[in-house]
Amino acid sequence: MATLLNIDSNAKTIKGQKQGFMTAILYLAPANSSGVNLCPMAKQAGCEAGCLNTAGRGGISKGSKTFTTPSGAVLPDNTVQRARLARSALFNDDKPAFMAQLKKEITAFIKKAQKKGLTPVVRLNGTSDILWENIPTATAPNIMADFSTVQFYDYTKVYQRLARPLPANYDLSLSYS
């Protein structure tokens, strides 16, 4: 399995290093493109067409080649899209293995950030809207509890999440199309 996290892989997060932060983002296949809906409000919010999934390198294909996802979505044929689908398949099919790999990568990411004198921050919903606060790991009620000194942040269209208790190190911003 390839890596799950993208570390400072876009211009916006690279700029954060000047402010003292190193960012790791998890990009999965959004909405229903993996065959499982990872963005529960995508249809209602009307954001499938404008999704970041095909922005940047995710939108560049080999020539004009495309491929069809398990849900029937047609996407640019590139390694970015195929990696997002592979990550999503692992998440959907073997959550314990996915969470173990995620913990391993966050641990390595923290060490990398600390070596550079930067503060690690993690965004788990780069192109998804998963309720991570409800997904247990082998050792904790959620991934944020496993890394209580690390700041996690996400954007969500599931407004009900903001009315519920969240881990102290998890910041959610409501984002609606």
Regions found by a protein language model. Give the residues of each.
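Class I S-adenosyl-L-methionine
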Residues: 1-177
